[in-house]
Design a protein with these regions (language model features):
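Intrinsic-disorder-associated, low-complexity terminal segments enriched in Asp/Asn/His/Tyr and depleted
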Residues: 5-8, 22-23
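Non-transmembrane, aqueous-exposed alpha-helical and coiled segments at domain scale
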Residues: 25-450
């Protein structure tokens, strides 16, 4: 699908009213984000939709994210750079809401260069994005280790400490790299961190080596094109450019509305686009929510539908469920409708993409959690604190299709049982399913037009 014919297909894909708005003024940012605990397959869907846009923008998170793409049979994992970087016609923007580790970013850039991706004219970096220092990672690791059995499952990438400095008004930003007194500012913040680090037991961390590498990498950041994100996006919208905001992690890891304290340190929901790119709420157009056909979670925290039996192990093996960033095995369970209703509500989701449907190919009966039972009653809402409330999922079983989906090219090619399962999800969630992923490859994504 090319940009030239994209507007003609919009009525099928986004609906008549929104298509008319896009065609008239072009002033909307579409949002794509995960509706579970992350790892929903956002990178693949962004890559699929990318030709319909001019700009792909990350608006929150940092190198704790891991977006996996398979292009021409090869696997690529992006942690900070937007998933549109492989398409030479697109601009990729790292927004002000993202926290940037120069070492991780340069490693990604080196990997792109090694496969012939010329990122120089494709990648923009917001001046107001905050920097992850080596001492942020040191504090993160020391703090997590000190928690013992109470660990929250940090990726140890320095994300939390960096956001703490941001809200505490102590942080360093990308734009600060160009200031003549940057080194003095860096040293002052490092000393604060080292004072904090004394509160924790000593850990194995070669700070001197990490700092040396960090200083080398910031020279690359200085060479990248830096922009005032808010002005850049506003001007792009004024000129009718199409923008897709790419979320990281998942909605259930949102700092305010996720399973606190087992959450990330940023707002992963659609509201984060406004602060993470510097745009007004009225600029938000479509909100595309991504969910797996089952559910996974990495690290600690509540997970109502978790399967700690052979079925859980089967889903993990069949779905290759190991963290793209940490390599940790993911916890697996059945799809959770109360949880999805919650995140659809929070995000204002207008359409759904269901991924990894093929992972269920060999299952005879597929369970779906339709409600919860807690505090002596059935409920379709999440309790205030999933960590402290004993929740029992109430399941409904659906017939599996027990066959490969490889030959399906359009939605109608899917087995009747597959269509029935997806139709039941669509009906229960009261949100249209527009995309169905039946394999890891780029071409294994079906657009549902009716």
């Amino acid at each position: 699908m090319t940009k030239a014919n994209f507007s003609n297909s919009l009525p099928l894909f986004w609906g008549h009213a929104q298509a008319a708005l896009h065609n008239q003024i072009g002033m909307a940012i579409d949002v794509l984000l995960g509706l579970q605990w992350g790892d929903e397959g956002k990178g693949k869907v962004v890559d699929f939709l990318a030709p319909n846009y001019d700009i792909i923008a990350r608006f929150q998170g940092g190198p704790n994210a891991g977006h996996t793409l398979r292009i021409e049979g090869k696997k690529f994992v992006l942690h900070t750079i937007p998933s549109g970087i492989f398409r030479k016609e697109l601009v990729n923007l790292i927004g002000n809401g993202v926290v940037v580790d120069p070492i991780t970013l340069v490693k990604e850039l080196d990997q792109l260069s090694a496969i012939g991706v010329d990122y120089a004219d494709r990648l923009l970096l917001a001046r107001k994005a905050h920097l992850i220092l080596p001492t942020h990672r040191y504090i993160d690791a020391a703090s997590e280790q000190a928690k013992g059995k109470e660990k929250i499952g940090s990726t140890l990438k320095g994300i939390g400490p960096t956001y703490m400095d941001k809200t505490g008004r102590n942080g360093l930003r990308v734009g600060d790299l160009m200031l003549p007194d940057f080194h003095a500012r860096y040293e002052a913040l490092k000393e604060k961190h080292l004072t904090i680090a004394k509160l924790y037991p000593t850990i194995d961390f070669d700070l001197e080596a990490e700092e040396q590498r960090w200083m080398e990498c910031i020279e690359t950041l200085r060479s990248l094109r830096q922009v005032d994100c808010e002005y850049y996006v506003a001007e792009a919208l004024r000129r009718g450019k199409r923008i897709l905001a790419e979320g990281a992690q998942g909605s259930m890891l949102d700092i305010d509305f996720g399973t606190y304290p087992f959450v990330t340190s940023s707002n992963t929901i659609s509201a984060g686009v406004c602060t993470g790119l510097g745009v007004a709420p009225s600029a938000i157009g479509e909100v595309i929510g991504i969910t797996k056909a089952y559910c996974t979670r990495v690290g600690s925290g509540p997970f109502p539908t978790e399967l700690e039996d052979e079925m859980g192990a089967f889903l993990r093996a069949e779905g290759s469920e190991f963290g793209a960033t940490t390599g940790r095995p993911r916890r697996c369970g059945w799809i959770d409708l109360p949880q999805l209703r919650y995140t659809i509500m929070l995000n204002g989701v207008t359409q759904l993409a269901v991924t990894k449907v093929d992972v269920l190919n060999r299952i005879r009966e597929i369970n779906v959690a339709t409600h919860y039972h807690y505090d002596g009653a059935d409920n379709d809402q999440l309790p205030f604190d999933l960590c402290q409330t004993k929740v029992t999922p109430i399941y409904k079983g659906y017939q599996g299709w027990e066959q490969s989906l490889d030959d399906a090219k359009v939605y109608q090619d899917l087995p009747v049982a597959t269509q029935s399962f997806l139709g039941a999800l669509e009906s229960a969630l009261k949100t249209p399913i527009r995309m169905v992923s039946i394999g890891p490859e780029r071409e294994k994504l079906i657009v549902k037009t009716t």
